[in-house]
Regions:
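Structural signature of eukaryotic scaffold interfaces centered on beta-propeller domains
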Residues: 1-13, 67-83, 144-152, 209-227, ...
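Surface-exposed loop and turn segments in beta-propeller and other repeat-based domains
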Residues: 1, 37-71, 114-140, 170-217, ...
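Short, conserved, GDST-rich strand-edge loop motifs in beta-rich repeat architectures
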Residues: 18-28, 88-119, 161-187, 232-243, ...
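Conserved beta-strand positions in repeat-built beta-propeller and related beta-rich domains
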Residues: 10, 16-22, 81, 86-95, ...
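Marks the mature luminal ectodomains of secretory-pathway proteins
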Residues: 34-35, 73, 121-123, 128, ...
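Polar/charged low-complexity regulatory segments
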Residues: 11, 28-35, 244-246
Length: 317
């Protein structure tokens, strides 16, 4: 990453930051102006956690069976804010060492609505002005991350499985309180069609026209839109474009819309399947790269039928 995508004048002529996933616990840095490189060490919040090397999938001609993928942080995706800080999806602790505030019985508003358990990757931030890295312990899992254009510089994330998580970066930078600054919400379809979030049936239950329905729509891509909604992609077959409208209190008001790629009567993809990378433009059009080798666009405004209710479960648009 080299700039804030909301304002690409940020960090002009500055350094470029990368991510190494399981290879090493540092951010590789390129300074194209000085023709130099650097490394920014990253580390878990828990000093007693050093991860575990991943077994080699096959014998390497060079490394043999040596387990070289041994990073503790597994940094996947960097993103830059308006002040040039680099925010990353990075492991802060053992995935199974779940903080109490994440779990059932916590007074955290997100946990009261939908408690969470194990999560494999969290957040972190590097501030070039102070040369300081800070791991951020989140309840929700992370994979990709993207800033909304709001007063809180809300950082939305994918990779949370049954929930989508966010961090109020303004609050976190002011207080350092990761627990208070974060939140998450499950994916709830408005299947009773009344326009608000109500009690819901679980993913393995049939639709009840009097209730809403929770779905396990883990996001791969995540993209906040200009209207305050948050979009993402789902990798399953045939895959889907997912739209979450947070509402006044996302813990309890967020509603999800789920738009699958079209199937024929035999359940075969008509053209293309399984969205991966995705972004949303200023007109609310979703642009996607598909695992089938296609590119695609989705224009919600062209949907003909209702966008909520008992039939709005994927193949309705």
């Amino acid at each position: 990453v080299s700039t804030d995508r909301r304002d690409p004048t940020v960090n002009a002529y500055g350094k470029i930051y990368g991510a190494l996933e399981n290879s090493a616990d540092y951010l590789p840095v390129l300074n194209p102006s000085a023709h130099s490189t650097d490394q920014i060490p990253v580390f878990p919040e828990d000093p007693n956690y050093d991860g575990a090397a991943q077994p080699a999938m096959a014998t390497s001609p060079y490394w043999g069976d040596e387990e070289i993928w041994d990073a503790a942080t597994t940094v996947h995706n960097p993103m830059m804010d308006s002040d040039g800080r680099v925010w990353i999806t990075s492991r802060a602790r053992d995935p199974g060492n779940v903080p109490a505030f994440c779990q059932e019985g916590s007074d955290h508003p997100s946990a009261q609505a939908f408690p969470l358990g194990r999560s494999g990757r969290h957040l972190g931030v590097y501030d070039p002005s102070s040369d300081t890295y800070t791991p951020i312990n989140t309840c929700f899992g992370t994979h990709h991350l993207m800033f909304a254009e709001d007063a809180d510089n809300t950082l939305w994330t994918s990779g949370g499985g049954s929930a989508v998580g966010w961090l109020n970066t303004r609050e976190f930078l002011q207080t350092g309180d990761a627990a208070a600054a974060q939140g998450w919400t499950p994916f709830i379809l408005d299947t009773n069609g009344n326009g608000r979030r109500d009690d819901y049936v679980e993913p393995d239950a049939d639709i009840d026209p009097n209730l809403d329905k929770r779905i396990n729509s883990g996001l791969y891509a995540v993209a906040p839109a200009a209207d305050g909604s948050v979009w993402g992609s789902n990798l399953s077959y045939p895959g889907a474009i997912v739209r979450v409208m947070p509402g006044d209190d996302p813990n309890t008001t967020a509603l999800t819309e789920y738009y699958e790629l079209p199937l024929d009567e035999e359940g075969n993809a008509i053209e293309g399947f399984s969205p991966r990378g995705m972004d949303i433009d200023r007109n609310g059009i979703a642009w996607v790269a598909l695992a089938s080798g296609h590119m695609g666009r989705f224009d919600r405004s062209q949907c003909q039928g209702p966008l909520n209710g008992p039939t709005a479960t994927g193949q309705h648009c």
